[in-house]
Amino acid sequence: DYIDLGVNEVVLASADNTFSALHEFTGEEIKEIVEECHMHHMTVTVLMNRLYSEKDIYAAQKEMEEILHLGVDGLMFADPGLLKYAKEKHLECYLTYRPETLMTCNEDALFWKEQGLRSVVIPCLLTKDEVMDIAKYTPDTTVIIHGSTLMSVSKRKLLSAYKQVNQKDFDVHSKTLSLKEKQREAYMPA
């Protein structure tokens, strides 16, 4: 039971509004989950972290407002078009900026916090040192500690493909593999 484990927040993905969710929820499902979670003193945050095209942004803005009216405690976003609309409606205090790749330093994080947001999520694709630097200088940040979600959600066999294309010899199931970019000193777990 998650409550016994100390879980105090549930993050849900809104249908058609994220690119990294394993399951997406409808408005009616979100409403039911909010009621259940609030009964157990847990907060509910909805993920709307995709970037929207010109033809989709206005519908997404309206949907964001509808989701917030379902009683959720917050909403995670990536598209500045959602922030613009939220500011017009005085809803920015419910928002958490959650870019998957667009924030790379504490100045980025501080900029988003200065927009009146609830929080920012430090991207899990950064190195541990980069994450720690951003968290050190930016108050009220969220750090994802369970690993790189984007690669795992994609279900692509990236290590196997790399091994085959580059004719390398290593165990793709090894727990000790890491990646190193040319311009960074730190290693990232694979």
Where are these regions (language model features)?
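Active-site pocket-lining/capping segments in soluble small-molecule metabolic enzymes
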Residues: 1-101, 121-190
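Intrinsically disordered, low-complexity linker/loop segments enriched in Gly/Pro
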Residues: 103-105
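Conserved N-terminal glycine/acidic-rich loop preference
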Residues: 109
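As written
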Residues: 116-117
